[in-house]
Amino acid sequence: MAFRNWIGAFGKANALDVNSDLDRGYEAALLIQSLELEYYGDRPIRPDLELSVPKSVQATVLRKFRVAINVCRASLDQLEYQRSQLDPQELRQLQLIESVVNRYSPKRVSTAPTMTRDPDPLPRSLLGVFDKVRRQLNPAGEATLVAGFRRRRDSTLISLKVLLLLILVPLLVQQVSRTYIISPAVDRFAPDLPFLSYPKPQLEEQAVEKLRVYKAEIEFDALLRGDTIPSQEELQQQLGKKASELKEEADAESTHAVKNVLADISATIAFVVVCLFSREELRVLRGFFDEAVYGLSDSAKAFAIILFTDIFVGFHSPEGWTVLLDGIANHFGFPARENFILLFIATFPVILATIFKYWIFRYLNRVSPSSVATLRGMNGGG
C-alpha cells in the first residue's frame, strides 16, 4: 500500500512538473512572438540589427528575448520525451514552443534517429507503450485529468468574462451617458453655443421636401373630399405651422451628431479602463484565442478565411460597404457623398485584399502550409 501511494505521489508530481514546464514555455513563446511583431515587423529577432528605438529599450527587448528563448529550450528539453502524456491542446502548445525554438536554432538536431546518432537501447515507441500503461495504472491519473480540465475550464470562464466586459461595458456606458448626461447637457447649452447645433444643408433639404409633400397632401385631401382647395391665406397659415414643427425637428436632429461623438468618446474611455484593469485576463483571453485558432482543422481555417475575404473584398462587398459608409456618415452628421463612397469602394477593398494575400504568403504559409493548400483547393485553385 505504501508503495502504491509512493507511485501515486510520484505520478502526480510528474504531471504537475509537465504542466508547469508547458505553461512556462508557452508563455515564453508568446512573449517572443509579441516582441517579433512589435519591434521586428514579424521577423526573427536579430541582436545585430539596429532598431529605431532608444538603446535602453533595445537592450531590454534583447534581454527579454534571451530569457524567453532559454525558457523555451529548457521546457522543450523537459517535455521532449513526455509527449504521450499530453492531450491535444497541450500538444498544440508544445508545437508552438518547438516552432519558436526551431526558428532560432536552424542547426538543431532532429530527435528522429539518424546514422550519426547512437541507437537507443530500446525503441522509443516501446518506451511510450510502457509509459502509457504506467499512466493508466497510476492512482493519481484521474486527479491529473481533473486538474487539467479545471485549468482549461477556468481559462475559458475568464476569457468569456473579459470578452463580455469588453463588449457590454462600453455599450452600457455609451447608452447611459448619452441618455442621462450628454443629451440633457447638449439640449441645455445648445441655444447658447451655436457650434453644438451647427447647420446642416441636408437637414434643410429634408425639411423643404417634407414641407412640399405636406402642401401636396393638403390639396390632395381637399380634392378627395370634394371640398374647395384652401385659399392662399389658409394654406399659408397651415404651412407656417408645419414649418415651425419641422424647424424644431431639424434643431433637435442637428445635435444628434454631437451627442453621438461625445457618447462614442465615453465608450472609448470605458473600453480603455476595462483594458487597463484586466491586463492579466487579457493575456488569458489571448491564449484562449490562440488555442481556439490552432485547434481548428485546416478545412475550417480555409473556410473562415474564404468567408471573411468574400464578405469584405468579394463580388458583393460594394453593397455592404455602401450601407456601412452611409450609416457612419449619418451617425456623425455628415452628408453621404457618392463620389467619396465610390472612391473608397474602388480602393480600400483592393488594399484589404492585398493585405490578406501578403499575410497568407508571409505568415500562414509558414505556420500551416496544409491550410494554404486547402485554401487554394476550396478557392478554385487561385
Curated annotation (Swiss-Prot):
The cellular location(s) given in this protein's UniProt record come to: Cell inner membrane
* Keyword Metal-binding included in the entry's annotation: no
Membrane topology per record: Multi-pass membrane protein
Transmembrane feature ranges: 156-176, 257-277, 305-325, 340-360
- State if Lyase is listed as a keyword: no
Q: Which domain of life is it from?
A: Bacteria
Any one GO CC term of this protein is: plasma membrane
User: Which terms does the record give in the GO molecular function aspect?
Assistant: proton transmembrane transporter activity
Q: Which UniProt keywords apply?
A: Cell inner membrane, Cell membrane, Hydrogen ion transport, Ion transport, Membrane, Transmembrane, Transmembrane helix, Transport
User: What task does this protein carry out?
Assistant: Required for H(+) efflux immediately after light irradiation to form a rapid H(+) concentration gradient across the thylakoid membranes. Together with PxcL, contributes to transient H(+) uptake following dark to light transition.
- Family label: Belongs to the CemA family.
- UniProt-listed PANTHER family: CHLOROPLAST ENVELOPE MEMBRANE PROTEIN, CHLOROPLAST ENVELOPE MEMBRANE PROTEIN-RELATED
In terms of NCBIfam families, this protein maps to: PRK02507.1-4
- Give the protein name, as stated in the record: Proton extrusion protein PxcA
Lineage in the entry?
A: Bacteria, Bacillati, Cyanobacteriota, Cyanophyceae, Synechococcales
